[in-house]
Amino acid sequence: MGEEQSTVSGSGGARASGGGSAGQPESPRPRGDRVRTAGPRAAASSSRPNGGGGGRDPGCVDASVQEPASNRAPAGQPARLPLSGPLDPQSLELQLEREAEGAGPREAPPGQQPPDGLLLDVLAQRHPPPAKPQVLCSVYCVESDLPEAPSAESPSPSESPPQAPLGPIPASPPPSFPSSPLSLPADPLSPDGGSIELEFYLAPEPFSVPGLLGAPPYSGLGGVGDPYAPLMVLMCRVCLEDKPIKPLPCCKKAVCEECLKIYLSSQVQLGQVEIKCPVTECFEFLEETTVVYNLTHEDSIKYKYFLELGRIDSSTKPCPQCKHFTTFKKKGHIPTPSRSESRYKIQCPTCQLIWCFKCHSPWHEGVNCKEYKKGDKLLRHWASEIEHGQRNAQKCPKCKIHIQRTEGCDHMTCSQCNTNFCYRCGERYRQLRFFGDHTSNLSIFGCKYRYLPERPHLRRLVRGSVCAGKLFIAPLILVLGLALGAIAVVIGLFVFPIYCLCKKQRKRSRTGMHW
């Protein structure tokens, strides 16, 4: 019924039957034809209607099409082989090779894949066609600075790519820009597959090995505070150990990170804002970024507090208790009462302490700042109160602000005016050579709490006597020294010529020369 059936003759030729064109031969079949032999599993398949044989492979026998009765063998007898001559299992390969040589090379029609090989069912054992291996492809995009050298082998005409038109070749974009889209077949196994556009973004390399070996040091923040500064194995100037060290930005000397952190922490504990370089030969100050980078969180807070305290003007002061900065406004935080000093009354928003902005002390109700500075009992009681084995606060002798000591010695430095004073007595640090300093017991500049603190009259008498003795002894020693010097000069004027003559006479007597 309009179907086309084809059978294979013993000589390998194809003939048309049942509705096909009688005078039109069928195209030769490729080498991949499936050949079936009789066996228990060989049976005729039911035919399915098809419009003129469309959609079938023209080079293969459709197993679903029913063969004519003339080509079917009787039941129980094997079917005829599509080979010329009898089938010998021992010489099967040789017969197949001869048949292939006789048929000659055949090409698959366009748009059709070539067959994989001959598939035979010998003795009712079907060998399935070999499965196509799965290919996993990894695409790598590598950009080279140098163009590729042309290949020595010239491609064949069928494989040669289309020639590009002559003209100037546009410059390739830098690696930081996305490369041109790359077209790849959708199915690598199919000759005419679709295309997939892939974009490869090549980020520029942050550094290169030759650049690291020959590049100069990074000119950033510098020092240990710079995370991008180069590391070099140097000997620390403090601990004298070889470590990976970033040189300091000020003097380019080597100080390890551990020693620098210990030094900076000690300076911050002393209240220093301008910290000098730990190298003794360098007289410059370290940068703020380097100091903050090498401090702990607590020391960093203290250092920033000292910085703010040194930068503020007279209209901003810290709270005496919690160090919260407060800026005074002329119209006051509290409505101005009858007395003018009440407008300096400040309540700290952090610790709720009420204090006086003018004298920087706790609020003194009913007493003006002048009386309070002269020795008010409230101020003395608050300042001289002992907490944790030390005074509550001490007043700077110059700027009159109160300073609390957390730890350390009695030598204090005011963060407001940089005045050196003693925390125990509140006096300035003075020293004079030959008369002593503030730490001397018998010096007139000594602390009153170091020598006879309970007997001030005797202390003054002893120190005054020592000072007077030094004043009287110093001129005597000076006069005595001048007298001895004059005597030595006079004696030298007479003795030196005589000594020279005697030495000259001895030299002549040794050489045998006479007058």
UniProtKB/Swiss-Prot annotation:
Subcellular location: Membrane; Cytoplasm
GO cellular component: cytoplasm; membrane
Molecular-function annotations in GO: ubiquitin-protein transferase activity; zinc ion binding
EC number annotated for this UniProt entry: 2.3.2.31
Gene responsible for this protein: Rnf217
Stretch list, region TRIAD supradomain: 232-451
Keywords per UniProt: Cytoplasm, Membrane, Metal-binding, Repeat, Transferase, Transmembrane, Transmembrane helix, Ubl conjugation pathway, Zinc, Zinc-finger
Null allele phenotype: Macrophage-specific knockout mice have increased iron export and altered ferroportin/SLC40A1 degradation.
Short name of one Pfam family: IBR_1
Residues annotated as binding Zn(2+) 1: C236, C239, C256, C259
Entry protein name: E3 ubiquitin-protein ligase RNF217
Residues where Zn(2+) 4 binds: C422, C425, H438, C447
